[in-house]
């Protein structure tokens, strides 16, 4: 819920506000709000994935800190739903550990449970929904191309 609220503030609301200020139609405002929500969520999921499977250098921040901080990201929640690994994932997330072996074990579980692939696919699906939201709405062609490029960049970025 917090993630969705944050995406409203950082993605959906600014785009909708821009459309309102620019004199956009109700259809344009709603399309840009939906686009911002979907791309904002996709961006966050990609950020979570980079924190887990990127490199410390590429992430340009602390590596695997989401595990240390016990964040219940989409990846973690998906892995927790697997009964075979629930207790171990819960223990690692609750421990506050920064032990590289424990962090690597968590990522190994995330891979074994398909949680990383699940999150990546979900982010791609959100990107498709974002693009569909603006597909049949009248927009400046250059603005449309920029929005579509941004949507792709958000899930393809490496840092």
What are these regions (language model features)?
Residues 1, 5-159:
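All-alpha prenyltransferase/terpene-synthase fold signal
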